[in-house]
Design a protein with these regions (language model features):
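N-terminal hydrophobic/helix-forming segments and targeting peptides
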Residues: 1-197
Length: 197
């Protein structure tokens, strides 16, 4: 088992912050707070960019990265409390691309009342009846299960159509490799942070 390093710890911290497209605020806040310890000036602009000016005598350089990640949003809430999901990014084919391989993955729902853990599930024939096999997944076959059994309970947390969802697997080491979600582009944010320090 590989020994954790400061860079691994930094990547783990950044990749485990939920920040689906359109709701990257927690990532921006972490960067602004952390970068202010080594920069002359740090700000979050009106359009959501985090800018840190480090200063110095040498030539000016710019390090760029983005903080969002692939995410989902709630399309509807079923009467029995399951959440129909849809991709945040435009999906031309109407079904999950190879970018999504989240069967039975943990997720975090960014509800109005705060983050709520859930599980992304696929409606198998045992659940929806008929047992028919499909040659591809459709978005209508995917749900998030929060462990509640009523629409009213789920909605009481401030969960509604448009609420964002981020995948939530742990970032970990497999041999010499780091695996997890949001590596694109939180690894670059980790490098920018390390360079700034």
């Amino acid at each position: 088992m590989a020994t954790p390093t400061p860079m691994f710890d930094l990547i783990k911290t950044l990749t485990e912050i939920p920040g689906p497209t359109g709701q990257e605020d927690l990532v921006h806040e972490w960067c602004a707070d952390h970068w202010s310890s080594f920069s002359e000036h740090t700000e979050i602009t009106r359009v959501g960019n985090v800018v840190a000016r480090v200063g110095g005598e040498g030539p000016a350089i710019v390090i760029l990265a983005h903080g969002d990640e692939l995410g989902l949003m709630i399309k509807s809430v079923t009467e029995n409390g399951l959440l129909h999901v849809w991709p945040v990014a435009r999906d031309m084919r109407g079904r999950p691309s190879y970018s999504y391989s989240p069967v039975n993955q943990p997720v975090i729902v960014l509800a109005d009342s705060g983050p709520i853990d859930g599980q992304l599930v696929y409606a198998s024939g045992h659940v929806i009846g008929g047992g028919t096999q499909k040659d591809h997944f459709e978005w209508n076959d995917w749900f998030v299960d929060l462990g509640y059994t009523s629409k009213e309970k789920v909605e009481s947390f401030g969960i509604h159509p448009g609420t964002r969802i981020a995948l939530n697997p742990p970032t970990r080491r497999l041999g010499d490799t780091i695996v997890g979600k949001a590596m694109d582009n939180r690894a670059a944010l980790s490098i920018a942070t390390s360079v700034g320090e």
